[in-house]
């Protein structure tokens, strides 16, 4: 039984969001670094630091919060894992779904690397749909 690193980072971010934690610590791999760069570029997280501890690298993410009248802080981050090791989901460039009419993003793994749905449509390439973020 293999380990699903993408599901692990999605679960870590979602759990930190529900508990209103400001930071999340996740293991650093090439896939997680690519996904975190997309989250940072799209504005879903504030800051990323790479931390080394006992010859292992970790990424420390600072989550982005917004003020809400009823609650003190509310995170605007919702994540959903789509393709998983037991059921891979692929899409060509014309059938990449739009999340909330373009407000959310789809992260894809393509032949040219991990990218958002907008980048994949511009380059006219499809790939494996990793997750939805809105």
Swiss-Prot record:
Its main location: plastid. PROSITE patterns: RIBOSOMAL_S8. The keyword Chloroplast applies. One of its GO terms (molecular function) is rRNA binding. It is found in: Plastid, Chloroplast. This is Small ribosomal subunit protein uS8c. InterPro entries: Ribosomal_uS8, Ribosomal_uS8_CS, Ribosomal_uS8_sf. Transmembrane segments: none annotated. The keyword rRNA-binding applies. One of its GO terms (cellular component) is ribosome. The gene is rps8. One of its GO terms (biological process) is translation. Part of the 30S ribosomal subunit. Belongs to the universal ribosomal protein uS8 family. Pfam families: Ribosomal_S8 (PF00410). Keywords: Chloroplast, Plastid, Ribonucleoprotein, Ribosomal protein, RNA-binding, rRNA-binding. One of the primary rRNA binding proteins, it binds directly to 16S rRNA central domain where it helps coordinate assembly of the platform of the 30S subunit. Disulfide bonds: none annotated.
